[in-house]
């Protein structure tokens, strides 16, 4: 636990003006990132945090509201606030957008088909995407994913080996990797930044997805960012969205 003077130093160390609740938010995110509070662990009460940080309870509540809005914590009525855990349900809600067309746009997580994993040196593009140095190693995971038994997605996932040591030696990798990152490597994904565009299937895509070359695909380029701001995963997905949609909720 941070002592009061240490917390006050953190709150006063920001050279640029930030609202007080934003400074409290930054302190709380840092503690989650550093493992002071583990996934699924209850956070101290708002009153306790306010006393420790030397701010009002309302300021802490506003910071907690921001954490909840970003799905970094979960609130349970009558029980308090908990660090978000990357369960399959949580991952589905936050990071997977493919859905079957319906009024509810029920999302799906495509199931794992084939998979290959290898370790190698990062190339120039990978170093640029993940802010790696020359000579850094990465793990490349290639997957096909299925919906109702039919291949729908080809994926290439690039991970910095220094963040995920020996991940390529795992006996088997789970369908949803974010839970593994959190439980085994203490890396919690805070944000996923995506770029989408329409492309035509090349010969490899067509063969993997059972399509004709030139068939339309949805190309999703995603960078996953950890709680501490570090870029931890580059994922490229090429999706056959026939009878599927990419669903987004805009508040």
Identify the role of each PLM range.
Residues 110-251:
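C-terminal all-alpha effector/ligand-binding and dimerization domain
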């Amino acid at each position: 636990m941070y002592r009061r003077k240490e917390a006050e130093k953190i709150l006063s160390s920001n050279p640029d003006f930030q609202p007080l609740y934003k400074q409290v938010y930054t302190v709380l995110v840092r503690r989650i990132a550093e493992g002071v509070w583990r996934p699924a662990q209850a956070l101290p009460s708002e009153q306790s945090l306010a006393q420790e940080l030397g701010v009002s309870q309302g300021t802490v509540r506003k910071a907690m509201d921001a954490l909840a809005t970003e799905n970094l914590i979960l609130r349970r009525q009558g029980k308090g606030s908990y660090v978000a855990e990357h369960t399959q349900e949580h991952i589905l809600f936050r990071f997977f957008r493919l859905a079957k067309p319906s009024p509810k746009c029920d999302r799906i997580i495509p199931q794992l088909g084939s998979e290959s994993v290898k370790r190698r040196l990062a190339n120039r593009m990978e170093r640029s995407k993940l802010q790696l140095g020359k000579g850094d190693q990465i793990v490349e995971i290639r997957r096909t994913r299925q919906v109702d038994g039919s291949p729908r997605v080809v994926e290439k996932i690039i991970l910095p080996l220094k963040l995920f040591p020996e991940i390529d030696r795992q006996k088997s990798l789970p369908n949803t990797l974010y839970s593994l990152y959190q439980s085994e490597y203490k890396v919690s994904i805070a944000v996923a930044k995506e770029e989408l565009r329409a492309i035509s299937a090349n010969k490899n895509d067509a063969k993997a997805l059972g399509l004709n070359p030139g068939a339309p695909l949805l190309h999703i380029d995603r960078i996953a960012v950890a709680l501490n701001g570090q870029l931890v995963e580059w994922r490229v997905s090429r999706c056959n969205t026939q009878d599927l949609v990419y669903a987004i909720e805009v508040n």
